[in-house]
Amino acid sequence: MPKMKTHSGAKKRFKLTGSGKLRRQQANRRHYLEHKSSRLTRRLAGDKIVFKGDAKVIRKMLGI
């Protein structure tokens, strides 16, 4: 059976943490920020951990 190829979109969007969890950025913080409140943009600033169910699929995409 041939090797699985890494999903290009997934490798750009997800990073593996030291403990083995997957990290992702939050949506809605790229552009059109002028009409969004400062409170909202601050809340969207940090990275989040991917949920277990989603992580299983993403791991396959990344070949982990």
From Swiss-Prot:
Keywords, comma-separated and alphabetical: Ribonucleoprotein, Ribosomal protein
The organism's place on the tree of life at top rank: Bacteria
UniProt keyword annotation of Transport present: no
Gene Ontology terms: cellular component: cytosolic large ribosomal subunit
InterPro entries: Ribosomal_bL35, Ribosomal_bL35-like, Ribosomal_bL35_CS, Ribosomal_bL35_sf
Segments of this protein annotated with the region Disordered: 1-29
GO molecular function, one term: structural constituent of ribosome
SUPFAM superfamilies per UniProt: L35p-like
Gene Ontology biological-process annotations: translation
Alphabetized Pfam families for the sequence: Ribosomal_L35p
Aminoacyl-tRNA synthetase found in the keyword field: no
Family in the record: Belongs to the bacterial ribosomal protein bL35 family.
PANTHER family assigned: 54S RIBOSOMAL PROTEIN BL35M, LARGE RIBOSOMAL SUBUNIT PROTEIN BL35M
Protein name, UniProt field: Large ribosomal subunit protein bL35
